[in-house]
From Swiss-Prot:
The chain crosses the membrane at residues 35-51, 54-74, 85-103, 106-123. Plays an essential role in heart function and development by regulating the organization and function of the sarcoplasmic reticulum in cardiomyocytes. Its main location: endoplasmic reticulum. This is Receptor expression-enhancing protein 5. It comes from the Eukaryota. Belongs to the DP1 family.
Amino acid sequence: MSAAMRERFDRFLHEKNCMTDLLAKLEAKTGVNRSFIALGVIGLVALYLVFGYGASLLCNLIGFGYPAYISIKAIESPNKEDDTQWLTYWVVYGVFSIAEFFSDIFLSWFPFYYMLKCGFLLWCMAPSPSNGAELLYKRIIRPFFLKHESQMDSVVKDLKDKAKETADAITKEAKKATVNLLGEEKKST
Protein backbone atom coordinates (compact mmCIF):
# COMPACT_ATOMS: atom_id res chain seq x y z
CA MET A 1 0.00 0.00 0.00
CA SER A 2 1.25 3.50 -0.69
CA ALA A 3 2.00 5.65 2.35
CA ALA A 4 -0.93 8.01 1.67
CA MET A 5 -3.41 5.15 1.28
CA ARG A 6 -2.09 3.42 4.39
CA GLU A 7 -2.40 6.64 6.39
CA ARG A 8 -5.96 7.17 5.14
CA PHE A 9 -6.81 3.54 5.95
CA ASP A 10 -5.38 3.94 9.47
CA ARG A 11 -7.36 7.18 9.99
CA PHE A 12 -10.50 5.36 8.85
CA LEU A 13 -9.81 2.53 11.32
CA HIS A 14 -9.48 5.04 14.17
CA GLU A 15 -12.79 6.85 13.55
CA LYS A 16 -15.31 6.33 16.34
CA ASN A 17 -17.96 3.70 15.46
CA CYS A 18 -18.98 0.21 16.55
CA MET A 19 -16.61 -1.56 14.13
CA THR A 20 -13.56 0.44 15.18
CA ASP A 21 -14.50 -0.08 18.84
CA LEU A 22 -14.48 -3.84 18.17
CA LEU A 23 -11.14 -3.52 16.36
CA ALA A 24 -9.72 -1.58 19.33
CA LYS A 25 -10.80 -4.35 21.73
CA LEU A 26 -9.26 -7.02 19.48
CA GLU A 27 -6.08 -4.97 19.17
CA ALA A 28 -5.85 -4.59 22.96
CA LYS A 29 -6.46 -8.30 23.65
CA THR A 30 -4.21 -9.71 20.93
CA GLY A 31 -1.52 -7.05 20.63
CA VAL A 32 -1.95 -7.19 16.84
CA ASN A 33 -2.24 -3.84 15.06
CA ARG A 34 -5.85 -3.12 14.01
CA SER A 35 -4.69 -2.50 10.43
CA PHE A 36 -3.51 -6.10 10.19
CA ILE A 37 -6.72 -7.39 11.78
CA ALA A 38 -8.82 -5.39 9.30
CA LEU A 39 -6.71 -6.55 6.35
CA GLY A 40 -7.03 -10.16 7.58
CA VAL A 41 -10.83 -9.85 7.78
CA ILE A 42 -10.92 -8.27 4.32
CA GLY A 43 -8.77 -11.13 3.00
CA LEU A 44 -11.04 -13.77 4.58
CA VAL A 45 -14.16 -12.11 3.15
CA ALA A 46 -12.50 -11.96 -0.29
CA LEU A 47 -11.60 -15.66 -0.09
CA TYR A 48 -15.11 -16.52 1.01
CA LEU A 49 -16.55 -14.52 -1.90
CA VAL A 50 -14.44 -16.64 -4.26
CA PHE A 51 -14.80 -20.10 -2.71
CA GLY A 52 -17.55 -19.94 -0.08
CA TYR A 53 -21.06 -21.33 -0.14
CA GLY A 54 -23.59 -18.49 -0.17
CA ALA A 55 -21.16 -15.92 -1.57
CA SER A 56 -24.12 -14.34 -3.35
CA LEU A 57 -25.88 -13.71 -0.03
CA LEU A 58 -22.76 -12.25 1.60
CA CYS A 59 -22.17 -9.99 -1.39
CA ASN A 60 -25.78 -8.77 -1.34
CA LEU A 61 -25.63 -8.18 2.42
CA ILE A 62 -22.54 -6.02 1.95
CA GLY A 63 -24.11 -4.17 -0.97
CA PHE A 64 -27.45 -3.71 0.78
CA GLY A 65 -27.02 -3.89 4.56
CA TYR A 66 -24.54 -1.10 5.21
CA PRO A 67 -26.05 1.30 2.63
CA ALA A 68 -29.55 0.70 4.06
CA TYR A 69 -28.29 1.49 7.58
CA ILE A 70 -26.46 4.62 6.44
CA SER A 71 -29.45 5.70 4.33
CA ILE A 72 -31.70 5.57 7.40
CA LYS A 73 -29.15 7.66 9.32
CA ALA A 74 -29.02 10.11 6.38
CA ILE A 75 -32.82 10.45 6.33
CA GLU A 76 -32.83 11.17 10.06
CA SER A 77 -30.04 13.76 9.85
CA PRO A 78 -30.81 17.43 9.08
CA ASN A 79 -28.11 17.44 6.36
CA LYS A 80 -29.65 16.86 2.91
CA GLU A 81 -26.32 16.38 1.11
CA ASP A 82 -25.96 12.84 2.44
CA ASP A 83 -29.52 12.09 1.29
CA THR A 84 -28.50 12.91 -2.28
CA GLN A 85 -25.37 10.74 -1.99
CA TRP A 86 -27.36 7.69 -0.87
CA LEU A 87 -30.22 8.28 -3.32
CA THR A 88 -27.57 8.27 -6.04
CA TYR A 89 -26.20 4.98 -4.69
CA TRP A 90 -29.67 3.40 -4.70
CA VAL A 91 -30.35 4.52 -8.28
CA VAL A 92 -27.07 2.93 -9.41
CA TYR A 93 -27.77 -0.18 -7.29
CA GLY A 94 -31.21 -0.51 -8.92
CA VAL A 95 -29.85 -0.16 -12.46
CA PHE A 96 -27.07 -2.63 -11.63
CA SER A 97 -29.58 -5.10 -10.14
CA ILE A 98 -31.73 -5.00 -13.28
CA ALA A 99 -28.69 -5.51 -15.53
CA GLU A 100 -27.45 -8.28 -13.24
CA PHE A 101 -30.81 -10.05 -13.36
CA PHE A 102 -30.37 -10.67 -17.07
CA SER A 103 -26.66 -11.52 -16.95
CA ASP A 104 -26.37 -13.33 -13.60
CA ILE A 105 -27.00 -16.77 -15.09
CA PHE A 106 -23.76 -16.42 -17.07
CA LEU A 107 -21.67 -14.26 -14.75
CA SER A 108 -22.22 -16.32 -11.59
CA TRP A 109 -20.20 -19.16 -13.15
CA PHE A 110 -17.03 -17.05 -13.12
CA PRO A 111 -15.01 -17.82 -9.98
CA PHE A 112 -14.25 -14.21 -9.05
CA TYR A 113 -17.70 -12.83 -9.94
CA TYR A 114 -18.97 -12.24 -6.40
CA MET A 115 -15.67 -10.76 -5.26
CA LEU A 116 -15.70 -8.39 -8.26
CA LYS A 117 -19.37 -7.56 -7.68
CA CYS A 118 -18.66 -6.83 -4.03
CA GLY A 119 -15.70 -4.66 -5.01
CA PHE A 120 -17.91 -2.79 -7.48
CA LEU A 121 -20.59 -2.17 -4.82
CA LEU A 122 -17.95 -1.03 -2.32
CA TRP A 123 -16.56 1.36 -4.95
CA CYS A 124 -20.09 2.70 -5.49
CA MET A 125 -20.60 3.34 -1.76
CA ALA A 126 -17.09 4.63 -1.03
CA PRO A 127 -17.13 7.68 1.27
CA SER A 128 -15.69 10.06 -1.28
CA PRO A 129 -17.28 12.74 -3.45
CA SER A 130 -16.13 10.96 -6.62
CA ASN A 131 -17.22 7.43 -5.73
CA GLY A 132 -18.48 4.92 -8.27
CA ALA A 133 -22.16 5.73 -7.82
CA GLU A 134 -21.56 9.42 -8.43
CA LEU A 135 -19.39 8.73 -11.47
CA LEU A 136 -21.80 6.23 -13.05
CA TYR A 137 -24.80 8.44 -12.35
CA LYS A 138 -23.26 11.58 -13.85
CA ARG A 139 -21.68 9.90 -16.88
CA ILE A 140 -24.22 7.21 -17.84
CA ILE A 141 -27.54 7.18 -15.98
CA ARG A 142 -28.31 10.92 -15.86
CA PRO A 143 -27.60 11.60 -19.57
CA PHE A 144 -29.68 8.53 -20.53
CA PHE A 145 -32.52 9.62 -18.25
CA LEU A 146 -32.54 13.22 -19.50
CA LYS A 147 -32.57 12.02 -23.11
CA HIS A 148 -35.51 9.64 -22.54
CA GLU A 149 -37.35 11.38 -19.70
CA SER A 150 -40.52 12.26 -21.64
CA GLN A 151 -40.94 8.71 -22.99
CA MET A 152 -40.34 7.24 -19.53
CA ASP A 153 -42.85 9.68 -17.99
CA SER A 154 -45.41 8.60 -20.59
CA VAL A 155 -44.86 4.90 -19.86
CA VAL A 156 -45.07 5.49 -16.10
CA LYS A 157 -48.29 7.51 -16.52
CA ASP A 158 -49.83 4.76 -18.69
CA LEU A 159 -48.88 2.08 -16.16
CA LYS A 160 -50.25 4.19 -13.31
CA ASP A 161 -53.54 4.74 -15.17
CA LYS A 162 -53.87 1.03 -15.98
CA ALA A 163 -53.12 0.11 -12.36
CA LYS A 164 -55.79 2.56 -11.15
CA GLU A 165 -58.33 1.19 -13.64
CA THR A 166 -57.56 -2.37 -12.54
CA ALA A 167 -57.79 -1.47 -8.85
CA ASP A 168 -61.10 0.34 -9.44
CA ALA A 169 -62.50 -2.65 -11.38
CA ILE A 170 -61.42 -5.08 -8.66
CA THR A 171 -62.93 -2.84 -5.96
CA LYS A 172 -66.21 -2.58 -7.91
CA GLU A 173 -66.37 -6.37 -8.36
CA ALA A 174 -65.56 -6.95 -4.69
CA LYS A 175 -68.36 -4.60 -3.66
CA LYS A 176 -70.80 -6.41 -5.98
CA ALA A 177 -69.76 -9.79 -4.60
CA THR A 178 -70.16 -8.53 -1.03
CA VAL A 179 -73.64 -7.12 -1.74
CA ASN A 180 -74.67 -10.38 -3.46
CA LEU A 181 -73.31 -12.45 -0.58
CA LEU A 182 -75.10 -10.32 2.02
CA GLY A 183 -78.31 -10.46 -0.05
CA GLU A 184 -78.15 -14.26 -0.19
CA GLU A 185 -77.55 -14.45 3.57
CA LYS A 186 -80.63 -12.32 4.25
CA LYS A 187 -82.76 -14.56 2.00
CA SER A 188 -81.62 -17.70 3.82
CA THR A 189 -82.49 -16.35 7.29
